């Protein structure tokens, strides 16, 4: 019985269309934000705006103050009424070094890569999109 429900949920999810251009634009926007460890404020502020636009309730703790950072952890909740267990997604906002001046370029094959020597989304920033 549980497998039948899971099969139906997967079938419904397969109907969802991904807006590839929106995903690329979001990726480019977020990876352009400099967010080194302990300096994630700009990333946190941008994510708070985006999450609220999507209907999430957003909270921020004060963990940054305890560890010398300028942003806390973000918790975003999206109330729902679908059957099944809640889903938890987790990521981090800081980027690996070198991260200053990141810029992505899109190759002919559609692969986004760094335009220079800075790391581009090779950490959880790619997962924030």
Question: Model-found features: residue ranges?
Answer:
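A non-catalytic alpha/beta surface segment that caps or lines the substrate-entry region
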Residues: 36-83
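Predominant activation on well-ordered alpha-helical scaffold segments within soluble catalytic domains
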Residues: 24, 28, 45-48, 128-129
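Active-site metal-coordination/substrate-binding segment of hydrolases
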Residues: 70, 77-79, 83-129
